[in-house]
A protein has these predicted regions:
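Acidic, divalent-metal-coordinating active-site segment for phosphoryl/phosphodiester hydrolysis
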Residues: 146-159
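Short secondary-structure capping/turn micro-motifs that flank functional sites
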Residues: 66, 114, 150-151
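Short alpha-helix plus adjacent loop in nuclease-associated cores
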Residues: 110-128
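Active-site catalytic microenvironments for nucleophilic, acid-base chemistry
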Residues: 97-100, 118, 136, 157-161
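Conserved non-catalytic scaffold segment of RNase H-like nuclease domains
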Residues: 1-107, 127-145
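Short alpha-helix boundary/capping motifs
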Residues: 77, 101, 111-112, 122, ...
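Short Asp/Glu-rich motifs
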Residues: 69, 117, 153-154
């Protein structure tokens, strides 16, 4: 796959509508072309996962709700397919958050986690977590669980196995 957008969401809590940040990396002709990052004021606005990504209400209270983040993100994505590591999670966050704000999106999603599990070159890996697979392909994911860093890692993986 040479043209796609790798995307990653971080959520504030267990609710799929609680996206608190999004990172996206656009790839065209097999090269990273551009990136998009935004904090999001989540709904509902309470934090359970600060220990994972470090974000809290202090970070996202000044941010826009997703209904304001979606138009520039949608423009950034354009007509490209989406790629995520564990796409069932990210696609459900996108779908549920869009539905909450009255939007929809039928962009196809591809999963680098599923592809990694099926890739014969990766059979000896300890696990197929994002940082493990990214490291195999030479990407140092120093800021794991920062949405843009995770999207960049996903893009690198996708360029190798999709």
């Amino acid at each position: 796959m040479k043209d796609f957008v790798a995307i990653d969401f971080e959520t504030a809590n267990n609710c799929r509508t609680s996206a608190c940040s999004v990172g996206a990396v656009r790839v065209r002709n097999g090269e990273i072309e551009d990136s998009f990052y935004s904090l999001i004021r989540p709904y509902p606005n309470y934090y359970k996962f600060t220990y994972i990504h470090g974000l809290s209400c202090e970070d996202t209270d000044p941010a826009d709700h997703f209904d304001k983040v979606w138009p520039p993100l949608k423009e950034f994505i354009g007509d490209l397919p989406l790629v995520a590591h564990n796409s069932p999670f990210d696609s459900s966050v996108l779908r549920d958050t869009l539905e909450h704000y009255g939007f929809s999106c039928d962009t196809p999603f591809f999963c680098t986690l599923k592809a990694a599990r099926n890739c014969s070159a990766l059979k000896g890996l300890e696990n197929y977590q994002l940082h493990t697979v990214a490291a195999y392909f030479g990407y140092d994911l120093a800021n794991h669980h920062h949405a843009l860093a995770d999207a960049e890692a996903c893009a690198i993986i996708a360029l190798h196995i999709l």
